[in-house]
Regions:
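N-terminal strand-loop element at the rim of the active site
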Residues: 5-66, 153
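Short hydrophobic "strand-cap" motifs at the C-terminus of beta-strands
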Residues: 6-7, 112, 135, 194-198
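Nucleotide-sugar-dependent glycosyltransferase donor-binding/catalytic pocket residues
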Residues: 8-12, 118, 162-165, 197-201, ...
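A conserved mid-protein helix/loop that constitutes part of the nucleotide-sugar donor-binding site
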Residues: 13-21, 190, 194-213
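A conserved, positively charged/aromatic
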Residues: 76, 103-137, 141
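Short His-centered aromatic/hydrophobic patch
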Residues: 86-92, 113
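A short, active-site helix/loop in glycosyltransferases that binds the activated sugar's phosphate group
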Residues: 130-168
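A short helix/loop element that forms part of the nucleotide-sugar donor recognition site in Leloir-type
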Residues: 167-185
Length: 219
């Protein structure tokens, strides 16, 4: 099969990391994989595993970017995807326009809700898909509540990761020595970690409240 993923850019982030990981897995299974984005630090990793990247300036939400639907349509004609996987709201709108100029036998469209999107009308583009992926039960219930979609089309699929790179094993002795050399104040302390960007909706406020209640001599 030929699978194309669509997102604003390939900077370092969870959505972007998942895009690259899925693309690599698809190529290992013998599928043809492509990604459309404005580029970024993870772009080279696509070519490393044999995927194709189409560069399109769709990272900024403006009128010039929405006009890229014509160029996106040409990419579709060139790559001939069987499945289009949209991962962000603004590119999803561009996708809606691009598909209008294609023949009646259009690709299957899959969208992934990566969070609790605000502005329901603007986010409605993510519901214009044959099937929808929700990354958690909370997100799935949010989609049911805020979007007029058939529940059978919304599938709960938890976010996966490359367990070779993101593993739960203890760090090596060399890594630990390097850490304590750089942060000696953490020696003999229990370390708590909240992976992810520093943003409110990822629970950073709750994490800070937790830290304030702990014994600072131990943590």
């Amino acid at each position: 099969m030929r699978i194309l993923q669509l997102l604003p850019e390939l900077k370092l982030g969870g959505v972007e990391r998942g895009t690259v990981d899925l693309s690599e897995h698809l190529t290992k299974l013998g599928h043809k994989s492509a990604v459309v984005s404005a580029g970024g630090g993870l772009t080279e990793q696509l070519s490393d595993h044999g995927a194709k990247h189409f560069s399109l300036p769709i990272a900024k939400k403006n009128f010039l970017a929405i006009k890229q639907y014509k160029n996106l349509r040409e990419i579709y004609r060139e790559f001939k995807p069987d499945i289009i996987h949209v991962r962000s709201r603004f590119p999803a709108w561009i996708n809606v326009l691009a598909l209008k100029g294609l023949p009646s036998s259009k690709p299957i469209v899959i969208s992934t809700f990566h969070g609790l999107y605000s502005k329901p009308f603007y986010s409605k583009s993510m519901s214009y898909a044959d099937d929808i992926i929700a990354i958690s039960k909370t997100v799935q219930e949010y989609v049911f509540k805020n979007y007029d979609v058939d529940r059978s089309r919304v599938h709960l699929i938890y976010r996966g990761c490359d367990i070779d790179e993101f593993n739960a094993s203890a760090p090596s002795e060399a890594w630990s020595n390097s850490w304590y050399k750089e942060f000696p104040q953490t020696s003999d302390k229990i370390l708590l970690t909240l992976p992810g960007r520093i943003t409110g909706w990822k629970g950073i406020e709750d994490f800070l409240k937790l830290l304030s209640q702990l014994d600072q001599a131990k943590y």
